[in-house]
UniProtKB/Swiss-Prot annotation:
UniProt-annotated binding residues for Fe cation: H236, D238, H290
GO molecular function: iron ion binding; S-adenosylmethionine-dependent methyltransferase activity; tRNA (5-carboxymethyluridine(34)-5-O)-methyltransferase activity; tRNA (uridine) methyltransferase activity; tRNA binding; zinc ion binding
InterPro entries xrefs: AlkB-like, AlkB-like_sf, AlkB_tRNA_MeTrf/Diox, ALKBH8_RRM, Methyltransf_11, Nucleotide-bd_a/b_plait_sf, Oxoglu/Fe-dep_dioxygenase_dom, RBD_domain_sf
This protein's name: tRNA (carboxymethyluridine(34)-5-O)-methyltransferase alkbh8
Stretches assigned to the RRM domain: 43-123
PROSITE patterns: FE2OG_OXY, RRM
Domain Fe2OG dioxygenase, residue spans: 218-335
Family statement drawn from the similarity comment of this UniProt entry: Belongs to the alkB family.
Location(s), subcellular: Cytoplasm; Nucleus
Region entry Disordered, spans: 563-582
Bias (Basic and acidic residues): 569-582
Keyword RNA-binding: yes
Amino acid sequence: MGSIDGTRPKLSKDNKKLLKKQAKAKHILLKHEGIETVLHLSQSLVVANGGLGNGVSRQQLLAVLERCGKVETLLMPPNKPYAFVTYSSAEEAIKAYSSLSGQELCGEDAEQPITLYLSFVEKVVVKEVLSPSLPPGLIIVEDFVSPEQERTMLESIDWDSETSSQKSLKHRQVKHYGYEFRYDNNNVDKDKPLPGGLPDFCTEALRKCVQRGLIKHDPDQLTINQYEPGQGIPPHVDTHSAFEDEILSLSLGAEIVMDFKHPNGSVVPVMLPQRSLLIMSGESRYLWTHGITPRKFDVIQVSEGQTVGTISGNSGELTLSKRSTRTSFTFRKVRHSPCDCAFPSECDSQQTQKEKSPPTVGELGASTLEREYVHKVYDDIAGHFSSTRHTPWPKIGDFLASLPKGSLVADVGCGNGKYLGVNKDLCMIGCDRSKNLVDICRERTFEAFVCDALSVPFRAGAFDACISIAVIHHFATEERRIAALQELIRLLRKGGKALIYVWALEQEYKKNKSKYLKESKTSQGPSSDALGTNLAVKAPLPIHTNRTSFHSQDLLVPWHLKPTNKSKVTPENKEQNEKEHGPDSVYHRFYHVFCEGELEAMCNRLSNVAVQHSYHDQGNWCVILEKL
């Protein structure tokens, strides 16, 4: 390194290279984090690339920094690629600046070494952050089982037995007892209990729960999951109508941090130590989602006394903990009556009672209708929906293939990310209103985030192209459909192109039936009469019969969430099939299906676009637009 006392000795080629990279690191810190470095000497430094977000633990960084002197404070903000260090004297800070800048450090899980870049900062402010409280109704019992009992339970799991109660789920092992837990709807088939009940090796742990008064109901369903480092659980609430109040989770083999999220957006990370028992009841069971972020390290408290409870955001107390193989035993009691909990807004039993008759737009209002009959539905059916959406449509693939290499493309309403990986030569970013669908995108390593199509958080003119596939037809009024179109065009640069697909009223066009009609196995009529397309009319929306022609433009379309292992259903065996497997869970999605010329006319109302091409593709009206 060159001198920092104002003189300018001749620099070697390596030193010049280091100073250039150090200047770049300063620029990045200022641009993205707002951290201002200073040219004069001080006791405090910012260590770029030396953060928890780079996979550098507190112990690892501290060992390097202490070579240069006594460290007074070391702040490591969660998930950030930098840290702040304050030495007891400016001389020690100068020594660190001179000797550690450019030093390589191997992160806990880094494939390549990390290079540290140090810069002086004026002052490091230590902000005291209190640990959040546990969600109401959440209890953690530490050391619930002994190490010997833990070993016995883990060794008793027969992962190799080939039964219907064992499956491989997204590369992790899972085993069910009592009833098979269905991950597509967080429920069980109550009419199909598994033989054998709960295993004997769990008896002692359950007896202890009863003796300590931790549970009111004896569990009759158990799911065992084995998680390797890097695996997680999407945020969810176990279906209210499926299980009784208490849900128990026993963590064996390793500790883990589980995230609890309130509907208001507040998140509480909770440490579950090895051999601890988690009990969710009341508000924590019915209102808060719980999940585990898929990663190989957790951010935890560094203090040894903080072995259980919530994780604070105090950057002076955080470090990384490398995950190990964790096996969770989740015990539930199957419910056989409707849920009557104190959280009706989140309760499927109480919502079903309110929604026995189809809604009217006048009663709900457009945004409420979309929230109840689009947003919530897609979150509930995300897994099943994604499993049916895997093959890109050829003409959409052709559009993406026609774009220049390196184009920046937004997929607004990307769903499960089916089109995000079609053309590897493009830089594609997806967004969707459904968090569960976005989670699926992230599992597939696509770039995607949650937002509303009416307000996409990107600057105007940022994209070379946009696609909107099967999105705009979910908006309940013409004004909102036009607003969604305007937002799409706002994202485009001048000369940028957009491809838009919406469902067509004309499922048979020029004597050719769409695939939607061709897949119909019956010729049933609509399930209710068409009630008109004027959304101001306070009449119930008609419920469409799947695989038939449309008789109204504004309607509800059913989605049948099918039980697993369901046999082929025909009119002749329908009654027997439902007796054996249970009926489908039915969700209704709002659609406005477009008539011929409607989409093109809507586009022509915008002054800054030109319709390049308009066509009908498999029951959809489609346009390609260019921004003027």
